[in-house]
Design a protein with these regions (language model features):
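Catalytic cores of nucleotide-sugar-dependent glycosyltransferases that transfer UDP/GDP/TDP-activated
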Residues: 1-170
Length: 170
């Protein structure tokens, strides 16, 4: 199973073959704001691709536009991906996270999802391009991720380095 954002730049011929699997709302920010999570499925060559659908985050551009303020989009995607697995009642043995955009997944697994089926999964993080490291201000990460204060200490932010008041997610 592969989980991806449903960007509008995905060619129409693939969009037309996606099937609706369900939707729900989840809290995201530290203020508890609720966001829509839609799940669209596409299958090819025996592989199931689940696309996380939310026009607020994925309706414009492509994965490489607007890199400056991507933290809201990828906090949403990381948490929505795990919430979708719970919604679909599918528990992986290992969650493979790729690049900084998914680097919060292991933290979410051990905090927000620790008492769920998906919270039992292990996680591995791979890196494709070290140029993009997801460096953001702590307040911005904390607001959008909704992660508690204790996560932002050097012993808990596994893999996330503190650099001059900002955090590097890789």
């Amino acid at each position: 199973k592969v989980i991806l954002p449903r960007y509008k730049c995905i060619p129409q011929k693939f969009q037309e073959k996606m099937e609706y699997r369900g939707s729900f709302y989840m809290d995201l920010c530290s203020d508890g704001k609720q966001y829509y999570v839609g799940i669209m499925e596409y299958q090819k060559d025996g592989v199931v691709y689940d696309f996380i659908d939310n026009d607020e985050f994925f309706s414009w551009g492509n994965p490489y536009t607007n890199l400056i303020d991507d933290i809201p989009k990828f906090c949403y995607f990381a948490k929505a991906s795990l919430a979708a697995l719970n919604y679909l009642d599918w528990t992986p043995d290992i969650v493979h996270c790729h690049d900084w955009q998914a680097a919060l997944v292991p933290l979410y697994l051990r905090t927000c999802f620790q008492n769920t089926n998906v919270g039992r999964a292990s996680a591995v993080l791979t890196i494709h391009n070290l140029r993009f490291q997801g460096i953001y201000d702590r307040k911005m990460i904390q607001y959008w991720s909704g992660l508690p204060d204790y996560v932002f200490n050097k012993d808990c932010m596994i893999g996330c380095q503190h650099v001059k008041g900002r955090y590097r997610l890789l």
